[in-house]
């Protein structure tokens, strides 16, 4: 579901308060104040918040008590304090009936347990997690003080698996399996906080797994030959993987659905189930495993499972990071997916509220990401989805016979009742996709899988209870049975994906799926080059400083592509194409490879999405522009043939050093490695200057240090260093102490990606950065002169209230909800060209010829005081808009074109830089980070920069060289304060 606006914030606030206040009811695992003298015997020690049940109990206090004297408690609260959440007048959760007292003191009774909430669903906004745990069920004779007790386990539903028990539960299933299967259970990597990301493989035998990996290696190089073997029957005894995973473990049933499925296939030879026609079928485990094997990953996010939240320890939603891969968990997950290249992937989620059904399964509505071979996906996607949905629905309470289904339009009993996302979003009456739920973003795991030839599904269960666990378990039974039955067709379909990619071939059948919201094929959705092709022949990423603005990013991309299964080559000689010479050592991505869809999705400029009423998430990926490196598509065939070697081993880049003298050393302000180097130097007490005037061999906005200080960073950073014979005009930077609030993107960017010294107390800061409206103490500090740098639509109200004459406009999106109320939000995004004012803040961008920026939020600065300096405005050129989704952006009256998007204001005791553009969104737009860092450095300038007398003034020019003594800094990702509780989703769509 889309992140909520007003309703979501209110619900989230209620949830947080409920989770933080001391528990008035439960008291955790309660103590009665004295050691119980007797034990209560019970028929079950496990109680559920979402299930009504009766528990037989008995005890003996050593004498015959009076019934009127018996008092009951659960935890440290009497039964009378346990009322379910139905408002002010909730019903008792615990009651006792059928109390019988024998003459010998034997007492028997029935404990009646009602729902903790107002039904059988512990919805995501309800603080059920605070109630789970062990409690003492105690009965006390108030006349004597004697008591009996039993420790009870109280969970949200019976099969719920907390993180602390996940490993032992899986190990127990493996230990007690009865089907003689090969079951491996291994770590595939570590999460940011150091937890194992575990994977279970279930196969007929180990040879199945080994043979598949060998077959996959062959299939990726000669798919036509493998396909011929399948068609002829020469290849018949082979098995293909079905990949099952979860990324949001706060959607609890999604974890337990996998565990219960694993338990079933490990311990039952056959599993009866109902199909979509209400017929009884048999799932024979060994027969199924003759055609498939299972890769089960209970969660990609163990920290979130441990702490009941959506994001990882950094607070990032990993299901918006599958391609950006700023987070370690995303890197682990995608590398494993690329290793196996399964035929299908089921990513299990929850929840959908205010929906027609309690189960929703992809495929998505349009618009579809242009690099997806959608015709191949759709050959089997709908059938595979229905195989899951039919069996899930018919073998749970969530079929057409349910009260919920009847309330939402079901007219017949015992029928499947679920939605296919693509179909649910389409209105036959209007012929439009009235409720789009798209896969335009590259960052969902199932979409990522599609780039690699895997049919990926997001599956949304409806509720947080045992019934949803059962539904998901049976859905997996239905889907895996379908894959086994259709193994050859599915595998041939994947082999066709490989063949098409290896030949860099394009099919007109794909383009039929790229339609408008009115369901009409959109002409030129895949923009074509001069040869009439969408995919280029090559991409070139230079590695020399003359051709590459950020060498560090060039080497980062090599590592990134290798991790994601993209084949990388390197030029062995200089090659000139269209008058441009690409130097030996440049990385080359030949698009004749099976990962060409993914490579192109990462490197191409992006798509302008026109006139859709809604998109689910960011549509712009464009690594060259958002990360900030030079990359050129080459459309001519064969120009690099015989001129490259494989470069599929990660290389460590080196600094690019040019010497013209030894008076001072200039560090080009061209990327994150430069920022990290400067912050490292400042932390060591080294004097660093911010160059205020351009000169020979350096630009305004670069950094300068004394020549003798370069050894302080000589082995760490891939930066461009120029030793010069003069001392550039510069001012000394005071080490920043940046106040950053708890925004996950900001904290990750400033601590992990840029190595700033950050403080949590604004009184200790010498500058503030924020992407959100500041707290009152921060506002007060800024009003008293503390420099402030703000970026994003979220700080504009504060800027308006603080800067005289400042105003802004937001283009709001108003969207009718499919199931709930109208939504109003501001998710428009754009990759666009800008014009810069003369400022230290933008000087390094202007010097590099980097006139492209990105924004998320759909806003402009409409007014500003005369004293302000305009830093950036959107270009007035007709082609300024490069990619994104912003309806009306290219209208004649100019929603964005020519408008101001950043100012600097220093007047009246205020020192504020305001960007209405985003800067740290998803920690992906790192090329824009230096707008913030330049603003910060510019506000902390002191005396003129000077150097010591050592060194020579005479120029000593030398040819530019790369030095083996300067190594690349590792790409940084690790812990920040978590987002906290589970994100609360809107009342409209699925929580992707």
Task: Please name every model-derived segment.
Residues 2-14:
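Bacterial N-terminal signal peptides that target proteins for export
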Residues 195-201:
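A short loop-to-beta-strand scaffold at the N-terminal edge of the catalytic core in hydrolase folds
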Residues 967-989:
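A cross-kingdom C-terminal cell-surface attachment/processing module
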Residues 945-964:
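C-terminal low-complexity, Ser/Thr- and acidic/Pro-rich disordered "stalk" regions positioned immediately N-terminal
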Residues 276-285, 293-398:
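Hydrophobic, small-residue-rich alpha-helical packing segments that form membrane-like cores
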Residues 13-22:
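Bacterial N-terminal signal peptides
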Residues 21-34, 959-967, 988:
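Sec-dependent signal peptide cleavage junction
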Residues 33-172, 188, 196, 219-252, ...:
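Intrinsic-disorder/low-complexity accessory segments
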């Amino acid at each position: 579901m889309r992140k909520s606006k007003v309703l979501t914030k209110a619900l989230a606030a209620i949830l947080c308060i409920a989770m933080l206040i001391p528990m008035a009811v439960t008291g955790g695992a309660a103590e009665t104040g004295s050691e119980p003298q007797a034990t209560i015997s019970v028929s079950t020690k496990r109680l559920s918040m979402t299930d009504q049940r009766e528990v037989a109990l008995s005890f003996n206090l050593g004498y015959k008590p009076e019934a009127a004297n018996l008092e009951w408690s659960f935890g440290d609260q009497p039964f009378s304090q346990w009322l379910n959440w139905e408002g002010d007048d909730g019903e008792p959760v615990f009651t006792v009936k059928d109390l019988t007292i024998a003459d010998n003191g034997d007492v028997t009774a029935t404990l009646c347990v009602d729902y903790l909430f107002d039904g059988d669903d512990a919805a995501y906004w309800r603080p059920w997690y605070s109630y789970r745990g062990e409690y003492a069920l105690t009965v006390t004779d108030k006349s004597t003080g004697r008591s009996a007790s039993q420790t009870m386990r109280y969970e949200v539903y019976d099969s719920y698996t907390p993180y602390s028990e996940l490993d032992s539960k899986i190990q127990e299933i493996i230990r007690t399996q009865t089907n003689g299967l090969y079951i491996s259970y291994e770590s595939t990597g570590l999460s940011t906080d150091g937890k194992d990301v575990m994977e279970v493989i279930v196969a007929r035998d180990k040879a199945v797994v080994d043979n598949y990996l060998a077959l996959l290696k062959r299939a990726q190089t000669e798919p036509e030959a493998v396909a011929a073997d399948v068609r002829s029957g020469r290849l018949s005894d082979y098995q293909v993987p079905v990949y099952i995973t979860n990324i949001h473990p706060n959607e609890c049933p999604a974890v337990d659905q996998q565990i219960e499925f694993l338990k079933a296939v490990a311990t039952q030879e056959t599993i009866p189930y109902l199909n979509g026609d209400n017929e009884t079928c048999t799932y024979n485990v060994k027969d199924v495993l003759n055609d498939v094997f299972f890769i089960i990953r209970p969660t990609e996010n163990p920290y979130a499972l441990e702490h009941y939240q959506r994001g990882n320890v950094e607070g990032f939603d990993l299901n918006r990071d599958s391609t950006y891969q700023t987070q370690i968990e995303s890197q682990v997950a995608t590398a494993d997916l690329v290793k196996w290249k399964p035929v299908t992937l089921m990513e299990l989620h929850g929840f959908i509220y205010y929906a027609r059904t309690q189960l929703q399964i992809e495929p998505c509505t349009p618009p579809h990401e242009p690099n997806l071979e959608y015709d191949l996906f759709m050959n089997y996607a709908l059938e595979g989805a229905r195989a899951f949905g039919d069996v899930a629905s018919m073998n749970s309470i969530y079929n057409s016979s349910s009260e919920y289904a009847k309330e939402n339009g079901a007219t017949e009993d015992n029928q499947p009742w679920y939605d296919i996302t693509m179909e649910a979003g389409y209105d036959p009456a209007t012929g439009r996709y009235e409720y789009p739920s798209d896969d335009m973003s590259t960052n969902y795991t199932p979409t990522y899988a599609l780039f690699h030839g895997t049919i990926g599904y997001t599956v949304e269960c409806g509720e947080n209870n045992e019934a949803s666990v059962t539904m998901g378990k049976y859905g997996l039974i239905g889907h895996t049975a379908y894959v086994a039955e259709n193994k050859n067709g599915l595998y041939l379909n994947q082999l066709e994906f490989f063949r098409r990619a290896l030949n860099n071939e394009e099919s007109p059948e794909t383009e039929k799926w790229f339609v408008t919201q009115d369901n009409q094929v959109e002409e030129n959705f895949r923009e074509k080059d001069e040869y009439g092709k969408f995919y280029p022949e090559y991409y070139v990423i230079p590695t020399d400083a003359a051709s590459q603005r950020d060498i560090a990013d060039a080497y980062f991309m090599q590592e990134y592509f290798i991790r994601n299964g993209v084949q990388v080559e390197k030029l062995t000689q200089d090659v000139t194409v269209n008058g441009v010479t690409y130097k030996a050592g440049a990385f080359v991505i030949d698009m004749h490879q099976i990962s060409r869809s993914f490579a192109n999705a990462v490197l191409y400029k992006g798509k302008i999405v026109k006139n859709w009423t809604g998109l689910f998430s960011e549509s712009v990926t464009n690594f060259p522009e958002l990360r900030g490196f030079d990359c050129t598509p080459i459309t001519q065939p064969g120009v690099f043939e015989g001129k490259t070697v494989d470069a599929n081993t990660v290389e460590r880049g080196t600094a690019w050093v040019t010497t013209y003298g030894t008076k001072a050393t200039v560090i080009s302000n061209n990327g994150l490695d430069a920022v990290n180097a400067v912050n490292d130097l400042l932390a060591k007490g080294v004097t660093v200057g911010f160059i205020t005037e351009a000169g020979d061999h350096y630009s305004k906005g670069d950094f300068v240090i004394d020549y003798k200080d370069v050894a302080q960073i000589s082995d760490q950073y891939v930066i461009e260093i120029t030793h010069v014979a003069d001392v550039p005009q510069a001012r000394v930077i005071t080490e920043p102490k940046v106040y950053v609030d708890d925004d996950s993107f900001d904290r990750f960017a400033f601590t992990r990606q840029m190595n700033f010294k950050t403080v949590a107390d604004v009184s200790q800061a010498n500058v503030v950065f924020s992407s959100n409206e500041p707290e009152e103490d921060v506002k007060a500090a800024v009003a008293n002169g503390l420099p402030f740098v703000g970026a994003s639509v979220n700080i504009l109200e504060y800027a308006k209230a603080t800067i005289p004459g400042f105003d802004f406009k937001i283009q709001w999106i108003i969207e009718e909800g499919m199931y709930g109320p109208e939504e109003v939000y501001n998710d428009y995004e754009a990759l666009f060209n800008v014009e810069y004012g003369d400022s230290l803040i933008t000087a390094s961008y202007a010097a590099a010829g980097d006139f492209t920026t990105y924004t998320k939020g759909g806003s402009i600065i409409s007014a500003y005081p005369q004293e302000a300096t305009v830093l950036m405005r959107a270009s007035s050129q007709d082609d300024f808009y490069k990619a994104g989704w912003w309806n009306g952006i290219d209208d004649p009256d100019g929603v964005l074109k020519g408008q101001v998007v950043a100012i600097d204001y220093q007047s009246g005791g205020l020192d504020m830089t305001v960007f209405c553009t985003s800067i740290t969104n998803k920690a992906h737009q790192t090329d824009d980070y230096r707008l913030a860092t330049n603003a910060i450095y510019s506000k902390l300038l002191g005396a003129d920069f000077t150097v010591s007398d050592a060194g020579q003034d005479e120029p000593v020019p030398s040819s530019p060289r790369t030095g083996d003594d300067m190594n690349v800094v590792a790409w940084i990702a690790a812990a920040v304060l978590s987002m906290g509780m589970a994100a609360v989703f809107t009342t409209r769509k699925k929580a992707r």
